[in-house]
């Protein structure tokens, strides 16, 4: 059990990542949060900015009512701003925004306007600072993620296989690829911490095959390791069958059906983790209140498969699964980059 107490080491960890974002003495910085945000991280962010001589100010919005039929977790599509133009304007005027909303701004509807206005956004995931401290980014991680993103942008086909029966193909031409290493200093861009992964959003009709979730894989929407096999059949991006007899399959079937939205069954993104500091067992070490599961997304060599929104394929939905799949082999145009769950030294 961790205590929500400010620690000097966490101020320093936050300051190091913020410094990497190009924040200098006297720079304004907007701290965007909502009433249900993790207050320890809000306080650490303010103290870290002051430690760097920046001039922080707070934008705090009420956490909105959940308009959906089920709890929403790990979507990356915060609804906290709610279209409030003054909040968007303040973010643009600040030039640098630290996002501490529960779900994050990555896919929020207001984010394009903030980025188009020239602001840069550091989204700090809703993790306990103990995890954030362990997952501090570094230059080597950034270099490898950049290299992997360039490789994926030039890839025509990703194929993923496993001994459990996974055989999935994603046609990558026209996909939008994002490399996330944990900070951004470039205006008009967004990064999130923890980082250490690369993901691609394929264009419509690009993903087909079978994905088998085996015991030990993870479902981060439910913050649990998979205990019994789940077999997903995917045709032209959509999950057309979800087979399995255990609680994992039932949870997934019920959650997807609750949305009443076909796009909740569609592929959001595909990619893989690259962070050697991210630990597979971490999900078992924290209570659900203290983790958002971001660490497992970044575990080196995991195949990160997600369902739900893909704006690059014209699909918008709040239903979302992030599924780190362990032990797969990932090939890009026939070149293996992950073998049996181990990231190869090719980036």
Regions found by a protein language model. Give the residues of each.
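Short loop/turn segments at secondary-structure transitions that flank enzyme active sites
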Residues: 106, 176, 238, 276, ...
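Phenylalanine-focused residue identity feature
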Residues: 14, 57, 96, 201, ...
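Active-site bordering "gate/hinge" segments
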Residues: 1-228, 235, 250, 261, ...
């Amino acid at each position: 059990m961790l205590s929500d107490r400010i620690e000097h080491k966490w101020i320093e960890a936050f300051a190091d990542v913020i410094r990497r974002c190009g924040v200098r003495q006297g720079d304004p910085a907007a701290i965007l949060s909502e009433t249900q945000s993790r207050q320890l991280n809000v306080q650490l962010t303010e103290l870290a900015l002051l430690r760097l001589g920046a001039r922080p100010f707070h934008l705090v919005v009420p956490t909105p009512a959940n308009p959906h039929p089920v709890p929403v977790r790990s979507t990356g599509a915060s609804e906290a701003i709610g279209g409030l133009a003054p909040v968007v304007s303040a973010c643009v005027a600040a030039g640098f925004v630290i996002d501490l909303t529960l779900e994050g701004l990555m896919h929020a509807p207001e984010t394009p306007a903030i980025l188009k206005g020239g602001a840069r956004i550091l989204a700090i995931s809703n993790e306990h600072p103990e995890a954030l401290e362990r997952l501090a980014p570094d230059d080597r991680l950034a270099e490898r993620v950049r290299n992997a993103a360039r490789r994926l942008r030039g890839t025509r086909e990703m194929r993923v296989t496993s001994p459990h029966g996974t055989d999935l193909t994603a046609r990558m031409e026209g996909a939008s690829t994002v490399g996330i290493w944990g900070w951004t200093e470039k205006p008009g861009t967004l990064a999130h911490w923890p980082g250490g992964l690369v993901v691609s959003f394929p264009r419509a009709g690009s993903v087909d095959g079978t994905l088998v979730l085996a015991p030990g894989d993870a479902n981060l929407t439910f913050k649990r390791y998979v205990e019994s096999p789940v077999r997903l059949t995917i045709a032209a991006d959509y999950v057309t069958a979800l087979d399995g007899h255990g609680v994992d399959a039932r949870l997934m079937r019920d959650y997807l059906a609750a949305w009443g939205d076909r796009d909740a069954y569609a592929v959001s993104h595909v990619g893989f983790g690259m962070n050697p500091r991210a630990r597979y067992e971490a999900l078992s070490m924290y209570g659900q209140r203290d983790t958002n599961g971001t660490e497992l997304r970044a575990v080196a060599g995991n195949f990160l498969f997600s369902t739900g929104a893909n704006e690059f394929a014209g699909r918008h939905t709040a239903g979302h699964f992030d599924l780190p799949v362990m032990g797969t082999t990932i090939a890009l145009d026939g070149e293996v980059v992950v073998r049996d769950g181990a990231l190869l030294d090719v980036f």
